[in-house]
């Protein structure tokens, strides 16, 4: 079975990373996957088709830039939409998976609506699924339109979360309108890494690094005020951290603090750390829960973003992490949060379902089989037969 998987990351790398994990799980289950990315290429993440990349100009996500940093125009959009349709038609896919839309990525409607319309017109029509994270940016004024688009174009909506922690209606109030289409998969995370012996470090990270330098700087300054000041603090700035910001962070490096851009063995570092300090992006949180490490979460909240704040609040309510609002981020407050987290127990192993990648592949297989199951043969006695008369 052939799966065409579309993903567009605009600022961070979380969407692309999750899509790559899902693509790997689908291949492990025997699917032939074409992973199509519309964002900037990322080292260490392989895709099958790279469209002309687009990124967000700022935290509002309303303006798109091309790979030269120029505003995209209508001609660029037409070329990109045509390129996407070309690779879609060439794939002859049985399943179309679209990441986030219609729950986000409205700025990509210029290419997604033609893609979905094309899929709708095909005979036989492919299975069409939406892949969406546990919590989305809440936009109540757009929910009716989102439901209409989901009903028109999508057979199923796969929510990569666990309702025991975050029911989808916590961020999308009209979730009940999609009853029958909406399915929870559990959290999507790569295979677990077993902890190894060694000095336990404090791991400080900010995802891809496009935002979060203030958190990293605050952590470097907070170290000496914490119970964990004797440990090495490893700070990962991220591949998207600007050169200017990285140089500014280097000024705070001292014995006991290691600063790097990224590590391919991030999962192993996390599994072995004494404590994690991070934002509350989907992938980092899922990996933190998988590793069962003590954590301080400082959710990204600039530009009116609410997704990470809700996720961090839900985890803090369960005692799985300490939360510090970005607006309250100071060296003193962060040090206090680190000390509270250091004294706290580790998160429970059964807090959430972390088998989302495998379950997604399983569900897509089930949906495809049900869609293509031949109709039952009619009864020999005719459709109105009700059984023998008494």
Regions found by a protein language model. Give the residues of each.
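A short, glycine/small-residue-rich beta-strand->loop->alpha-helix junction that serves as a flexible
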Residues: 7-20, 212-213
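Active-site-proximal region of nucleotide-activated glycan assembly enzymes
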Residues: 110-184
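Donor-nucleotide binding loops and adjacent catalytic segments primarily
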Residues: 23, 172-174, 187-275, 309, ...
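Nucleotide-activated donor-dependent transferases that construct or modify glycoconjugates
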Residues: 1-12, 98-100
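C-terminal amphipathic helix plus adjacent low-complexity
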Residues: 336, 340-390
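Conserved nucleotide-sugar phosphate-binding/catalytic loop shared by glycosyltransferases and other
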Residues: 3-6, 25-75, 79-81, 86
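A donor-sugar binding/catalytic signature common to diverse glycosyltransferases
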Residues: 39-40, 265-309
